[in-house]
């Protein structure tokens, strides 16, 4: 049984390169001795394995991993599922499924988000205070060559980050409590009020998005309002799990071993 780890390219790990490497390394260490980790841009068709433990996001790498899947290899997360985390596709799919996401209209401003891939820089997810600012930022996106985007209304409430692994592992945290941030956008929601909400319901919705995409190792963001209503504002394949790395790595190892033995 040959296992290979695929490390995420730094362009898709803004301010998180080492954190992403650490969670992948811990998982590989738990799966066996001296498992090779390859940068996703270095993966070639000649690199054959039974299992690919992958954090890859480059389109060329995903195409290669899809070929490996089609040939019978186990890939976690599946390259097909990672493609379905594209914001444009996922936002529409969640809307059709009736899952709780922000409307495109609101009174507290807007978020303009790159829709064709995960954010690579702060410029890919931008807060706009009104329609005029939104139009200006959309023009800036076009100048940068970005024409695929989504618009979400800004929602007042607590920002919650959640992390999950298929099979039951689920944790959530308030980033404004510990100050860990990629781009500092959390400050727009202010200090966390820790509004009461149904954690089991949030986990159930997160697991539905996991099933919708096929992503088995995932993370995301939600906004919890004062009334306890929550909205999913982001969902990603294999985050760094920096707030719960040890627990998460054990859950991922257990999940992958079960998949191998099933």
Regions found by a protein language model. Name each.
Residues 181-232, 244, 251-262:
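A long amphipathic alpha-helix within ATP-dependent nucleotide-binding catalytic cores
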Residues 128-213:
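Phosphate-binding site of ATP-dependent enzymes
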Residues 115, 154-155, 163, 221-223, ...:
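Anionic group-transfer/hydrolysis microenvironments
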Residues 5-103, 118:
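Conserved N-proximal alpha/beta basic substrate-recognition cap immediately N-terminal to
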């Amino acid at each position: 049984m040959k296992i290979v780890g695929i490390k995420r390219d730094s362009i898709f790990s803004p301010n998180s390169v080492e954190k992403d490497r650490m969670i992948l390394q811990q998982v590989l260490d738990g799966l066996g001795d001296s498992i090779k980790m390859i940068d996703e841009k270095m993966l070639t068709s000649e690199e054959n394995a039974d299992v690919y433990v992958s954090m890859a996001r480059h389109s060329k790498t995903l195409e290669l991993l899809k070929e490996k899947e089609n040939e019978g290899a186990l890939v976690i997360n599946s390259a097909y599922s990672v493609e379905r985390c594209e914001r444009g596709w996922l936002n529409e799919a969640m809307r059709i499924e009736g899952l709780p996401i922000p409307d495109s209209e609101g009174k507290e401003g807007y978020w303009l988000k790159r829709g064709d891939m995960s954010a690579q820089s702060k410029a890919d997810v931008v807060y706009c205070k009104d329609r005029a600012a939104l139009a200006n930022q959309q023009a800036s996106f076009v100048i940068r060559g970005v024409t695929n985007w989504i618009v979400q209304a800004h929602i007042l409430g607590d920002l919650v980050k959640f992390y999950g692994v298929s099979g039951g592992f689920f944790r959530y945290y308030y980033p404004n409590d510990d100050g860990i941030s990629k781009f500092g956008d959390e400050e727009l929601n202010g200090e966390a009020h820790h509004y009461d909400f149904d954690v089991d319901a949030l986990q159930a919705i997160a697991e539905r998005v996991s099933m919708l995409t096929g992503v088995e190792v995932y993370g995301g963001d939600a906004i919890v309002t004062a009334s306890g209503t929550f909205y999913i504002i982001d969902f990603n394949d294999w985050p760094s799990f920096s707030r719960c790395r040890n627990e998460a790595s054990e859950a991922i190892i257990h999940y992958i071993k079960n998949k191998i033995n099933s």
